[in-house]
Amino acid sequence: MPRRSIWKGSFVDAFLLRMKKKRDLLFNRKIWSRRSSILPEFVDCFVRIYNGKTFVRCKITEGKVGHKFGEFAFTRKRRPSRTNIGPGRKRGKK
C-alpha cells in the first residue's frame, strides 16, 4: 500500500535522475541519498549506499523497485538477545 500521494510521484534526487540517462555512471556509485526511490532504470546495477558510517554494497533487482535506497543499508548493528544466564554471571539486584 503506497504511503505517498499518487499525484506527487516518487521522490528521486536530481543527481540520480541525471544518471538514469547514463547507466554506466551508476555502476558501483556511492549514494548518500537514502530517501530516494529506486527506479526501474536502476535494475541490475551495483550501488554503494551510505549507512552513516560506511558504504554498503547492494545490487538492485526488480523486487527492490519502488522501495527506498535506505531500506537496504541498515544503520544499526544486530545484537542477538542473551536468553540464558551462564554460571559466572550475576542476575542483578533484587
Swiss-Prot record:
It comes from the Eukaryota. The keyword Mitochondrion applies. SUPFAM superfamilies: Ribosomal protein S19. GO terms for molecular function: RNA binding; structural constituent of ribosome. It is found in: Mitochondrion. PROSITE patterns: RIBOSOMAL_S19 (PS00323). Keywords: Mitochondrion, Ribonucleoprotein, Ribosomal protein. The keyword Ribosomal protein applies. One of its GO terms (biological process) is translation. Pfam families: Ribosomal_S19. GO terms for cellular component: mitochondrial small ribosomal subunit. NCBIfam families: rpsS_bact. Belongs to the universal ribosomal protein uS19 family. PANTHER family: RIBOSOMAL PROTEIN S19P FAMILY MEMBER, SMALL RIBOSOMAL SUBUNIT PROTEIN US19M. This is Small ribosomal subunit protein uS19m.
